[in-house]
Amino acid sequence: MAFSIIMLACLIVCVGIDYLSLKRIDQNGALLGVTLPPDAAALPEVQSIVQQYLRWLRIICLLCAAGGVGLFFLPDSLLRVMVWVYFFFGSLALTYLPCLWANRTLQRLRDTHGWPAAPGDVPWKYGLFYYAPDDTRASVPKRIGKGTTANLATLRGKLAVAVNAIA
């Protein structure tokens, strides 16, 4: 019972932090990781994409928190611990799905309108993954959210991701 209470509290806090972090859509001149012309943010198409992104982000975060409440009632067993751990990390990963969708949609919109891609957009895959062989830094500031992300083109970046995935 105590384990479920602790896991539920951690899940709600972590999903809440993810929500607050991912809610910041405009960072370093890039809207959801895509650099657009200054007047493009006011276009109805762009506003629609942003509103859909925020709506899906809220829905997924609320569903993950509600799903955690349902897991609270599982009987005590080792299976419950496994389910909690998988659900916890799965919930954190699910919150990034709207980011991937919105980034790809904005990139297609940029290409449709013929707006040039900024040089800073090239090494970013989906606005989340950084791959720049010419950049020797192991980690760089994120374009979506807070913190840093690994440069997947460097050995140190790959090792950092591998260690985090194993841990």
Located regions from the model:
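Alpha-helical transmembrane segments
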Residues: M1-D18, R80-Y96
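Hydrophobic alpha-helical transmembrane segments
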Residues: A2-L8, C61, V69, A167
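Alpha-helical transmembrane segments of integral membrane proteins, especially early/N-terminal helices
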Residues: V15-S21, S48-I60, D121-F129
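Membrane-proximal soluble regions of multi-pass membrane proteins
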Residues: L20-V34, Q107-L155
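Cytosolic-side membrane-entry/anchor segment at the start of a transmembrane helix
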Residues: K23-I60, P98-P116
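Select subsegments of transmembrane alpha-helices in polytopic membrane proteins
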Residues: V50-L63, L155-N164
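Juxtamembrane "helix exit" motif at the C-terminal ends of alpha-helical transmembrane segments
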Residues: C64-L79, A165-A167
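Alpha-helical transmembrane segments and their immediate juxtamembrane interface regions
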Residues: L78-P116, N164-A167
